[in-house]
Amino acid sequence: RWWWAIAIGFIAGLHHVYYTNILCQLTLLGAVIQFRRHRSFPVLLSALAVIAAAAAAFVLMNLDTWTYKLAHGANGGAMVREYQWLELYGLKIKDLFVPPLSHRSELLAGFSRSHRAVAPLLDERASYQGIVGLACLLWLAFEAVRAMLDRRERDVPMEAWQVLWIVLMFTTGGLNAILGAAGFTLFRSGCRYSIVIMAITLLWAVRRGSTLERGVMRGRVLNGAALGMAGAAAVAACMVIVWDEVPRPPTKEEVAVIARQVDSDRAFTAKMEAALPEGAMIFQLPIMEFPEAPVPGMTPYDHFRPYLYSRNLRYSFGSMKGRPREAWQQELGKRSLEEAVAEIEKRGFAAVSINRNGFPERAQPIEKALRAMGYSKPPIVSATGDLVCIPLEKP
């Protein structure tokens, strides 16, 4: 079992740093509680070994990034984590009870809409524990409180301490926020640990239910009726979970909108490839940084849409922000349109692609100005009208 624990720690270290972080925290928390209960130093040493295995895997996964940083210098702009995000995306207990907007029950979906219309801080909207998950969480809380009231501290489930720690650490304004105020803002989205709470409570409920079943059935023999009732209860629970957790399917109208967008993007890209030389570079407007830098009217990664269907075109969007290689793009915004286009052509770009959603007046002034500059070759326009490509070629 010791080697299994080491292996689990190492595998966790290979995954997203959020879950490496919580594994190490909960492992150390469990070791401290067990040491307090049993005064066992081997427990502490085992926990430290698991944490060391996770740390070793974390180092292995990030070694290339760190060596690149040593060779090329730090990139302070690549991953910006401001303190405000720790407050906005912190874990909120009430959000564990708020169903998604896509819930199959119109009553619950309406409750979610009403909540989101007035709530000042909205997280990533994925903290809902579900009916069964909430029942297990409340059951765990009841067992823990009852044990404390009866002065049976040793009987408080370890899982209760783990959930309590997650809440204290990652809730809005919690210990993670204190660390953030001191400058450590890496773990900005404490709400993501809601899935860990669900996993802990469900596993505890299964173990607790199995223990109760063994106690009730000790010395008894189940007859067919009892087995049938148990099976029916399990099936009913599964049906509730599926109904509660699987979102309402999109309507035909919603599917049709997505299909039109996909078909439009695919056809638009095919027209660009037919009109431009193989390997041509396309400068995309509005100028956006990557990653996580949206502009009004566009999501952060809208510029990737043509890339999904391209075979031989190259695009200006997608280089990691913070490095000097692409700083010239941001400088274009300080120049006149004529100077900016001249610089774009000088760097070898064959066309300008405009997402009209990212501009006031749907970018019509820019398109008119380009035509006035002599780029009057017929533009390539997507079927949905939001994308337009203007070749930088004068007749």
Regions found by a protein language model. Name each.
Residues G76-R81, G110-I131, R152-L203, S319, ...:
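Membrane-helix boundary/interfacial segments in multi-pass membrane proteins
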Residues R1-F10:
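Short hydrophobic alpha-helices at membrane interfaces in multi-pass membrane enzymes
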Residues F10-Y19, T172:
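Transmembrane helix irregularities
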Residues L28, L48-A55, L203, R208-E245:
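Signature aromatic-anchored transmembrane alpha helix within multi-pass, membrane-resident enzymes
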Residues R1, L26-F35, C136-A147, A160-V163, ...:
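Transmembrane alpha-helices and membrane-interface helical segments
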Residues M61-A141:
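Periplasmic/ER-lumenal interhelical loops and adjacent helix-loop junctions
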Residues I22-A55:
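Perimembrane helix-loop-helix junctions
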Residues A74, A236-P395:
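Extracytoplasmic
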